[in-house]
Amino acid sequence: MNFHPELSKISQVTNNIFLSGVFPMEQDPTVIKKLNIKYILACLDRQYVSDAHNAVLIDNPECTILYLPYDDDVSQNLWCKNKNTINLVKYTRTMEEYNCLYKQFQMYQNKPMIEIGYHFINNAVESGNNILIHCMAGISRSVSTLTYYLMKKYNIPYSQAIKYVKDRRSIVNPNDSFKLQLQGYQSKKENFIESDGKKVTDFFKYGQSRLK
């Protein structure tokens, strides 16, 4: 089986935004500190990357990690609401830091997970900090979340946003359900909600006849 070289690479997408899978951190946990990354948006369940992230946090204790537990599956609704499913992790040294982190965690309750991702990315970028967005391979889940950020932030269509990312990381390829959900957002903008995402996932689960 061929191993694409980009799987072991952290790709720089903008001045502050980086994209990858977990492999670069497994190979070298110090790479996060070397790239001056202060925020990590992990678009997968924490259990799959806990060892790699623990090593990162030991080397870079100022880093904040947000976990959006997405599955790379056509049944995954990117707009599903957070019902105590996300994790927000940071080594806090003072009660003030802890309270700030807890306030942020509470603010994310009952919000669409992709919107939480947008907020987390935007906060990092607006504060001038570097952020890594990753999933297992840096191909589908993390790419979809980043593409949504670009679409919303710059009011651009899906095709333009995904091309921008693909020009900087050639292996990107969101699954078909994620593509349709993002294209649905393109059509409806902020009116695209969790039930719209469910229509897309139901299409793949049941077929078009069940959507009528």
Swiss-Prot record:
UniProt catalytic activity: O-phospho-L-tyrosyl-[protein] + H2O = L-tyrosyl-[protein] + phosphate
Keyword Hydrolase among record annotations: yes
Any Pfam family the entry gives: DSPc
Tagged with keyword Endoplasmic reticulum: no
Gene Ontology molecular-function annotations: MAP kinase tyrosine phosphatase activity; MAP kinase tyrosine/serine/threonine phosphatase activity; protein tyrosine/threonine phosphatase activity
Active site: C135
Top-level EC class: hydrolase
UniProt keyword annotations, A-Z: Hydrolase, Protein phosphatase
Domain Tyrosine-protein phosphatase: 9-191
Gene Ontology biological-process annotations: negative regulation of MAPK cascade
EC number: 3.1.3.48
Membership in a protein family: Belongs to the protein-tyrosine phosphatase family. Non-receptor class dual specificity subfamily.
Protein name as catalogued: Putative tyrosine-protein phosphatase R622
